[in-house]
C-alpha cells in the first residue's frame, strides 16, 4: 500500500536535525569521550579531553555550536519503495531544510557555489545527498555535518589484490599518521573497503555514522577494527595532537564486493565532534 509523505514534513525535520546535531553530540560519542578521559595516560591529554567535554556541556546549555565549523550538510536518505512524495521536489525540500536550519540556528555558512570561483552561497546549500531505496513505507534520514579540517585529511588508496590485508592496514595507518594533529584528534576513523573508487568513499562516509559501541557484524572485520584502534592509539598523536594514548575513539569499517583486479580502500577521518542525527518519518 502506498503511503504519501508531504515534502514540507521532510523540510521541517531537516531544519530541526541541522540545529540539533550542531549543538548536541550523540550519546554514544559523549560516552566515548568520557571513557577516553578516564583511560588517557597523559596528563596533558587528559586535560584536553576534559576541556572538550566542558565545551560539549557549554554548547548544549547555551545553544552555541559545538564547533565553529558547522560543516557541509551530508545526508543518507533511505526511502521505502512504498512511499510517494507530494509537494516540492524532494531534493529542493531537503535543501530548504538546510537553508532554514543554518539560518535560523545561526550556524556558519561554509559552502561555496563553485570550487574555483569560491563565492559563498550564504545558506550552506547545496547539501550532499545519498539516496537508497529500501523495503517499506518509511523514510529514514541520517544527517552528518562534516567539517573540513578532518575531511581534508581523508584518503583513497587503489590497492592491488596482492597487497592483501596488510596493505589495507598500512593504508589506514598511513592516513591517520599523515592526518596527525590536523584532524583535531581524538578521531573517528571511517573506512570503506571494496566496491569501486566512489563506492569505497561512500562506505567510509557511512561508517562514520555507525554508533561507537557497535562493531562490524563480520567477525574478521570486527577483529580488524579492534586491532587498528589499538595500533592507532600507540602512534602517540594523542588528544589535540599534543601526545597521549587517545588518538582515535573508534575505527569503523564497511566492506563491499569488488572487482577481481582491485582492492579500493577509503579512509574518511572525522574529528572528535562526530556529529549526526537520525529520524524516521
Question: How should these model regions be labeled?
Answer:
Residues 1-191, 196-281:
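Non-transmembrane, aqueous-exposed alpha-helical and coiled segments at domain scale
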Amino acid at each position: 500500500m502506498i503511503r504519501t509523505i508531504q515534502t514540507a514534513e521532510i523540510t521541517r525535520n531537516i531544519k530541526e536535525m541541522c540545529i540539533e546535531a550542531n549543538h548536541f553530540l550523540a550519546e554514544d560519542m559523549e560516552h566515548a569521550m568520557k571513557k577516553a578521559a578516564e583511560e588517557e595516560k597523559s596528563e596533558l591529554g587528559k586535560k584536553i579531553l576534559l576541556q572538550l567535554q566542558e565545551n560539549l556541556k557549554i554548547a548544549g546549555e547555551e545553544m552555541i555550536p559545538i564547533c565553529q565549523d558547522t560543516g557541509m550538510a551530508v545526508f543518507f536518505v533511505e526511502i521505502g519503495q512504498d512511499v510517494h512524495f507530494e509537494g516540492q521536489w524532494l531534493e529542493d525540500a531537503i535543501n530548504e531544510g538546510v537553508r532554514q536550519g543554518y539560518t535560523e540556528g545561526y550556524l556558519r555558512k561554509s559552502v561555496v557555489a563553485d570550487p574555483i570561483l569560491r563565492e559563498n552561497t550564504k545558506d550552506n546549500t547545496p547539501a550532499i545527498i545519498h539516496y537508497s531505496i529500501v523495503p517499506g513505507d518509511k523514510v529514514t534520514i541520517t544527517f552528518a555535518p562534516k567539517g573540513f579540517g578532518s575531511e581534508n585529511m581523508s584518503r583513497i588508496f587503489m590497492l592491488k589484490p596482492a597487497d592483501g590485508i596488510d596493505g589495507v592496514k598500512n593504508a589506514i595507518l598511513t592516513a591517520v599518521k599523515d592526518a596527525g594533529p590536523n584532524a583535531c584528534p581524538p578521531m573517528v576513523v571511517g573506512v570503506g573497503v571494496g566496491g569501486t573508487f566512489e563506492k569505497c568513499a561512500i562506505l567510509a562516509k557511512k561508517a562514520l555514522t555507525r554508533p561507537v559501541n557497535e562493531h562490524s557484524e563480520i567477525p574478521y572485520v570486527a577483529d580488524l577494527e579492534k586491532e587498528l584502534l589499538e595500533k592507532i592509539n600507540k602512534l602517540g598523536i594523542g588528544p589535540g595532537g599534543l601526545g597521549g594514548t587517545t588518538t582515535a575513539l573508534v575505527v569503523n569499517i564497511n566492506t563491499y564486493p569488488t572487482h577481481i583486479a582491485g582492492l579500493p580502500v577509503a579512509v574518511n577521518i572525522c574529528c572528535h565532534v562526530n556529529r549526526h542525527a537520525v529520524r524516521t518519518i
